[in-house]
């Protein structure tokens, strides 16, 4: 046993210090980024925000809408190959280029992933997703996927430390997914005592990834657009959002009615709700590590995406970054004891 004494920070522990700027308007800020990925060599340009691969968020409908904003969607792994086939036939390649095919790490998952990718060459992204990216089995699966799919962009995770980011990149990942426990409906930190404050994880993992020519995605911990800006400011190349995109028309959560008001259920993918839906219940050897919440229906996701992107542009103008890529170079974090004036409630 040992204790690391250094302070680790989450998004709520800091604010971004404003700086002199030559920008006259938020409209001058360019959010699109261009990447050439380490292993696949593929060039991609777009707004580096990703809808999370949760079965109530990473849906086909979400992918269609977000593609119109040049935003990615990690489509959840529970659609059948037949459902994927119908989707591929229905949408243009411009949508498919903004889609990640999510997979688990079993042999059946691998076979299913290959069948889905064979449906269209426009499907370029793979998201290999497990709660604990530190297992040898996960690394072996990543190596197997890289060997089978040399031209695909592989996003793999989740981890929170630099040495594991390096191992995953050297094993074939183009992008490493960073975050253990920060999600809005994740209870891993409560159930296990394991985790890492998200901003510090992003800063440390970005440094490790960029040293090897890889990228990271900050997964979890964002509850407002300012948190998204902080993630990019901390060095994240992509930011993945679940709760901020939940409860919209494009989601597939079950709708319930209470006292005449309708709500949509949103739950973590290790919650009892998720395990009942997909594997028949919680296995007797494990505990659920997610919760279920009821969200008021929020309408179309369009307005939420515009709000997030507007907040990002504004953050860039406050520090003089004309392009999103410049935000991390222009960011100085200050530690704070409060985030906002709550006299009329939280914004």
From Swiss-Prot:
Q: Does the keyword rRNA-binding apply?
A: no
The alphabetical list of record keywords is: Metal-binding, NADP, Oxidoreductase, Potassium
Pfam families (alphabetical): IMPDH (PF00478)
UniProt: NADP(+) binding residues: 108-131, 216-239
Gene Ontology BP terms: purine nucleotide metabolic process
- The active site annotation covers 186
Query: Which SMART domains does the protein's record reference?
Result: IMPDH
For this protein, the record's InterPro entries field holds:
Aldolase_TIM, GMP_reductase, GMPR, IMP_DH/GMP_Rdtase_CS, IMP_DH_GMPRt
What protein name does the entry list? GMP reductase
Identify the species of origin.
Answer: Yersinia enterocolitica serotype O:8 / biotype 1B (strain NCTC 13174 / 8081)
* Taxonomy of the source species: Bacteria, Pseudomonadati, Pseudomonadota, Gammaproteobacteria, Enterobacterales
């Amino acid at each position: 046993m040992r204790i690391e004494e250094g302070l680790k920070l989450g998004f709520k522990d800091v604010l971004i210090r404003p700086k002199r700027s030559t920008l006259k308007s938020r409209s001058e800020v360019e959010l699109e980024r261009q990447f050439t990925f380490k292993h696949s060599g593929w060039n991609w340009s777009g707004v580096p925000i990703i809808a999370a691969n949760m079965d109530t968020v990473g849906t086909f409908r979400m992918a269609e809408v977000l593609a119109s904003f040049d935003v990615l969607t990690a489509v959840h792994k529970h659609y059948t190959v037949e459902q994927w086939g119908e989707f591929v036939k229905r949408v243009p390649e411009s949508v498919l280029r903004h889609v990640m095919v999510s997979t688990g790490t079993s042999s059946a998952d691998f076979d299913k992933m290959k069948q889905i990718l064979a449906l269209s060459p426009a499907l370029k992204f793979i998201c290999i997703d497990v709660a604990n990216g530190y297992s040898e089995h996960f690394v072996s699966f990543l190596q197997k996927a890289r060997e089978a799919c040399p031209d695909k962009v592989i996003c793999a995770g989740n981890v929170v430390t630099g040495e594991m980011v390096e191992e995953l990149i050297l094993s074939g990942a183009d992008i490493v997914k960073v975050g253990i426990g920060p999600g809005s409906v994740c209870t891993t930190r409560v159930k296990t005592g394991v985790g890492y404050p998200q901003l510090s994880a992003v800063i440390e993992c970005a440094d490790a990834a960029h040293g090897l020519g890889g990228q990271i995605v900050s997964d979890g911990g964002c509850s407002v657009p300012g948190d998204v800006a902080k993630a990019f400011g901390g060095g994240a190349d992509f930011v993945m959002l679940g709760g901020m995109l939940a409860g919209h028309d494009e989601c597939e959560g079950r709708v319930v009615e209470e006292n005449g008001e309708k709500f949509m259920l949103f739950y973590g993918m290790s919650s009892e709700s998720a395990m009942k839906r997909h594997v028949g219940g919680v296995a007797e050897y494990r505990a659920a590590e997610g919760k279920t919440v009821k969200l008021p229906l929020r309408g179309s996701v369009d307005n939420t995406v515009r709000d997030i992107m507007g907040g990002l542009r504004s953050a860039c103008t406050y520090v003089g970054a004309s392009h999103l890529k410049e935000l991390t170079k222009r960011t100085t974090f200050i530690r704070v004891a409060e985030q906002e004036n709550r006299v009329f409630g939280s914004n």
